Design a protein with these regions (language model features):
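A short beta-loop-alpha structural element at the N-terminal edge
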Residues: 7-21
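Small/polar loops that bind or transfer phosphate-bearing groups
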Residues: 11, 120, 156-157
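A short helix-loop-beta-strand connector motif used in the catalytic cores of GNAT acetyltransferases and
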Residues: 47-62, 66-74, 93-97, 118
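Conserved acyl-donor/pantetheine-binding loop and adjacent beta-alpha core of acyl/acetyltransferases
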Residues: 71-129, 139, 144, 177-187
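Conserved GNAT acetyl-CoA-binding A-motif
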Residues: 138, 145-158
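C-terminal "cap" of GNAT-fold acetyltransferases
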Residues: 158-162, 168, 174, 178-195
């Protein structure tokens, strides 16, 4: 599957049910080598999920592909339908990570001259992992943040996501342990990059 088969667009509120399903599949399908089942369950209840503020701000991107693009039978074409296969965003707000359920939110606006834009909430469907979709979204986020005047980016990367972000020039700054609703701790990595 080439990147030409992927369409990027801004997320809209009507995408939330599909995003919830995608996030659940992404976390359960791709993060099991880096996190325990208890950490995954706790994270899905606390920090992994939809952040409606990113959608409202127009800074959350979805990648769409044809529903049957992976295993399509050309002899028996099926109706054209796009599905969301990945998502990710950037923020002009202080919150570094967290979904609508996260209580540690800081919704104050950042100053592009002093602060780093936040790269946020990247999730890829397991069937679309390692196909360049996350990289496409990351590039679009960085370009949009640059256009808004930001010269630095930072994130709280999962142990799984840190591999991609490291390959894209992000540098680990420090480990972070996020307390989860079920008493577990979720290790993530604070990463930064110059624009």
């Amino acid at each position: 599957m080439t990147q030409a088969n992927i369409h990027l667009r801004l997320a809209v509120p009507e995408d939330v049910p599909a995003l919830r399903e995608l996030i659940n599949k992404s976390v359960r399908g791709l993060q099991t080598l880096d996190y325990s089942p208890a950490q995954i369950e706790g994270a899905l209840q606390t920090v992994f999920g939809v952040d409606s503020q990113l959608i409202a701000d127009g800074t959350y991107i979805v990648a769409e592909a044809e529903r049957n693009a992976i295993a399509r039978d050309e002899a028996a074409p099926q109706p054209f339908e796009l599905i969301i296969v990945a998502c990710g965003g950037w923020s002009k707000r202080k919150t570094l990570f967290g979904s609508d359920h996260w209580t540690g939110r800081e919704d104050a606006l950042l100053d592009p001259l002093r602060d780093a834009a936040k790269i946020r909430a990247f999730f890829v469907h397991p069937d679309w992992a390692r196909r360049g979709v996350g990289s496409m979204i990351l590039q679009a986020c960085e370009d949009a943040a640059r256009s808004a005047g930001f010269t630095r980016f930072e994130m709280g990367a999962t142990l799984t996501g840190a591999k991609l972000f490291g390959a894209k020039g992000y540098v680990a700054v420090k480990p972070i342990s996020i307390p989860l609703a079920n008493g577990e701790l979720l290790p993530v990595i604070h990463m930064e990059k110059q624009a």
